[in-house]
């Protein structure tokens, strides 16, 4: 963090890895960032997801990840530890972050369009490398439910932290809730 604009104040530092935040823990990440940028707010995909779900009064979540079973289960346990009910869970079982970023959006849309939402108030799609952001609106219309993703909640929380939380079209219901 000390090398990020070393002579400048930064309003918000974004740590952009969902599973990495869960593994390291928010407090550990925040401490390291605050050493270099003590005045900056800090956000991560996992903490932003919790804030977004709470803002939207969502308790029952369908969780999708692209991760291996082991990593998927860690994300699942994290959401449970934050008192969310996971109504269903599915994952791709992809090991490498590079491969996650290569998932075709049409394929992702097809898979998520068929996900079991029975009892869920929202679908959360984990991983900042997964290219879901451009299809969130389309998915929300198809599924008739709120769809949240790591990048989406991270952008939303960053905008809130820097007081730029106007409504933004095209990125799901979350951005209409400001």
Language model segments and positions:
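Non-catalytic structural scaffold of enzyme domains
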Residues: 1-178
